[in-house]
């Protein structure tokens, strides 16, 4: 993973080097699109189209943006924004905010073998506004192979135990 990755920056100079603390995640940089499906005991199963973007500004984190819309009619479904950090070798942290009033800090393991990146994360902190649904447990699994990103999300919410909620397969569209 010794590749240098650059990104346009809003700061003078315009292009910045990837911070060495997150160089192990360089292969994630860019835009990914694909399809996923969701289910939960309290809702009808659904399918969605997704776009995920990983970027950087030369600091020790990646920026993360996620947007989904319904396959059936294109209406917006969900969004997340946040940051990915590598505090130590083999460790990863995600700091995420949802427009539904939920924030989460997930921590876990990071494994890089050849061109494959794997992350196993569990929420250590979940914050909620007074009007947000009762989400009390979250965990995620990510696997990135060259130009292919898959993930699953497990959730415990509204009186239900932690269980499968989402799965998606995305393909790189822009580095």
Locate each region found by the language model.
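Polar/charged side chains located within well-ordered beta-strands of beta-rich proteins
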Residues: 64-66, 80, 140, 151, ...
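Short hydrophobic/aromatic-rich beta-strand segments that constitute the beta-sheet cores
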Residues: 34, 62-66, 92-96, 118-123, ...
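Acidic, glycine-rich flexible loop segments
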Residues: 101-102, 120-139
